[in-house]
């Protein structure tokens, strides 16, 4: 633990010197371990293996992902001291400033227990950073009010399908959560079935980025679902390569004109050695290649019913590139990436598609999911003349809405639910960077762009990307996706024809659409 932190703790809490063997440097946590710390404080009995949650992070400063956990220690009286660096936007909104704070969490036997059913319930399939940030602010603004954050797939043997079925049954029975995070759900089906309330009494839609909000607004201006965050599926390359990759078919032909990617991953020594001539793009699995296409094409598959042409276009792209790359030999390849950050900007994540272009430099072009304007700034500083463009696909202006919010019409606490949603779309949440995407509030988005893009070229590149966004793309039905992936693998292995694969996918889509009606 830093000596400055030790001195501060000794001065504030005399018990701290006797606890130094029970501390750990939280700032060294990364990935899943850091996310677990944000979820709360756990303990494991000596010799045991099950982790017991003793401090729920949802009700503490730990949940605010804009903060950096720095250290924690357990005191002899059983309480916990936690040091965090709290990030606060500067007066001009262009930078953030970190202030260290010490928090103490302890058991209060005399504290009044919350009455059963007195909490506002927020539900999501997966953990959501923006939601946790809003929970912290909501409880601070409403003393005595608590939020029960139900994460369906956390520490549960329940499958995704079972979790969704349980949610649907509860909503149809007039019970269930007050606020629903609809990420990875068919949000349009929930809205069309009248299960969600209008949000416009709690969210100023005029303050949102207009082209991002427009797809979610009804003709009368109402909105049952709104995204609090978004990301963009992108590709990167030279101006000449980007001009030659305007469609999926164009991109396939470009990739086929370049060397094929070897069937290697980060565990192979050759992976890090420069090739004489780079291959087109880096993919480590058929699933990754399919996702690449679907993230800019999925809505087209069910446009005016089952769209045979669109199904064929996606399968043909995957077959051409996957067969050329020999992806039937891509068995268990390890995914790779890197995350970098600085005090002046938001973190930048390079997944496989970017890593193999900018780090190993064996791919000629990059692809990724852009979660921050800082990604574009990073790309513009790479060696070579790289720009960022929307990923080619079958729809215009694809973006990925995140933290899709809805309020249940059967909520017994509609005003409290509305107040929570207001915080999600308010300045305090929207102005802070979260790891799950960019803010939809127009002013906060512009502040983020100008804070992260120091070059005029990067600034104009980001603005052009944002202005071109038009169509939200959400996760395709899991049964349909499984059918797509199964047929994609069979196509690449030469075990089926394109016509047969297309028929199989179309049948799955037809069944899905019939079940929705």
What are these regions (language model features)?
Residues 218-336, 409-415, 497-500:
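Helix-loop-helix "hinge/cap" segment bordering the ligand-binding cleft or interdomain interface
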Residues 260-261, 421-446:
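Periplasmic-binding protein-like
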Residues 184-234, 249-250, 385-390:
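Hinge/lid segment of periplasmic solute-binding proteins
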